[in-house]
Amino acid sequence: MAHYRASIDVQQPPEEIFAYLSDFSTTREWDPSVVEAERLNGEAVGEGTEFRLVAEFLGRKNELTYRIVEYDPPHAVTFLGENATVISRDRITFEPAPAATRVTYDADLALKGLLRIADPALALAFNRVGDRALAGLRRTLSPAHPQSVSRSSPSSGPAAA
C-alpha cells in the first residue's frame, strides 16, 4: 500500500475550502494527474455522492469511481475510490491554524490481487503524484499568497487484502 500525507495552510475559512474540496469534480482544477472529473449523482454533495475521475498514473489513464463515505462539514471528508486494479482512500481534514486553515490530505492507494507485488514501486510514484497535486492545490487555494507546506515522511505499509 502507498501512503501520502501532507498539509498546507491557506487563508480561506474552513467552510469555503470544505465546500470546494468535498466536490471531487473540482479535482481536475488542482491535480495535474486528473484529466477528467465529474459528479455522477445528486445536486448537493454529501455522504454517498459519487464521482468519476480519470487520472494519468505511470503513463496510463486509470478511471476510478469515488464515493463520499464520511462527510462532516467543515471538518473532514473521506472518499473511497475503486476500479478493477486499485482501491484509493482520500481523507481531507480542515483545522484552525494561526491566521489560517490547515488542510491535511491523507491518501492510501492499494493494488488488488497479484498486482500487490508492485506496491513498493507504487509508493514511490504515488508520493511524486501527491507532491504535484499538493502544489496545484496550494496554487488554486492561495494564488497570491505562497503558503507553508509540510509533508510527513513517505512510507509504504503492508498491502491491503
What positions do the PLM features span?
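Beta-strand/loop substructures that line and gate deep hydrophobic ligand-binding cavities in soluble
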Residues: 80-132, 149
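Glycine-rich portal/gate segments that line the openings of hydrophobic small-molecule binding cavities
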Residues: 38-86, 102, 132-151, 159-161
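Amphipathic alpha-helical segments that line or abut small-molecule/effector binding pockets
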Residues: 15-18, 131, 135
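Hydrophobic ligand-binding cavity/cleft-lining segments
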Residues: 1-40, 46, 158-161
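Structural motif
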Residues: 11, 71-73, 97
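Extended beta-strand/beta-hairpin segments
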Residues: 1-3, 96-98, 149-152, 158-160
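Well-ordered beta-strand positions in beta-sheet-rich domains
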Residues: 5-7, 63-65, 89-91, 106
